[in-house]
C-alpha cells in the first residue's frame, strides 16, 4: 500500500510540474499616437455616445496632415448633405493626452469642443476615438469618402 501511495504521489507531481502555461508569443497590441501623419485620410463616424448612427445618418471627415486642413460631409440635423471645410490642430494637454481641435472656414467659428483623440482597434479595422467628459465619438478609418447626394 505504501508503494502505491508513493507511486500515486510521484505521478501527481509529474503531472503537476510537467504542465506549463501556454506562452503568448503575440506582440502586445500597440496603437500609434494620433499625430498629423497618422490622422491623415478618410474617417466615418460609426458611434456617437456609444450608440450606432441611424442607417440614413452619416458624417465623413478627411484630414490632410500636411496642410492641417479637413473636409467634412454630414447630414446630422438635416436631410441634405452639409459640406464643411476648415483647419485643425493636434496638441497635448498638461496630462500628455493628445487633443484635437478645429475651426470652420465659413465663419461659424471653432468646433464646439476640443477632444482627446486616440486610436483603437476592433477586429481588423482601425478606429479613432474622440472623447470629452460629456461626449464620445468613434470613427472608422475608410479607404475613401463615398459618393454623396
Per-segment meaning from a language model:
Residues 26-44:
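N-terminal helix-cap/turn-to-beta initiation motif at the start of protein domains
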Residues 24-28, 81-93, 127-149:
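Edge beta-strand at a domain terminus
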Residues 47, 71-75, 100-106, 128-132:
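Short beta-strand segments that buttress and anchor functional surface loops
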Residues 1-8:
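Bacterial N-terminal signal peptides that target proteins for export
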Residues 53-97:
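N-terminal glycine/threonine-rich, aromatic-flanked beta-hairpin/loop signature
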Residues 96-121:
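An anionic, turn-rich surface loop/hairpin at beta-sheet edges
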Residues 15-18:
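C-terminal motif of bacterial Sec signal peptides marking the signal peptidase cleavage site
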Residues 41-67, 103-111:
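Short, solvent-exposed loop/hinge segments that bridge or flank secondary-structure elements
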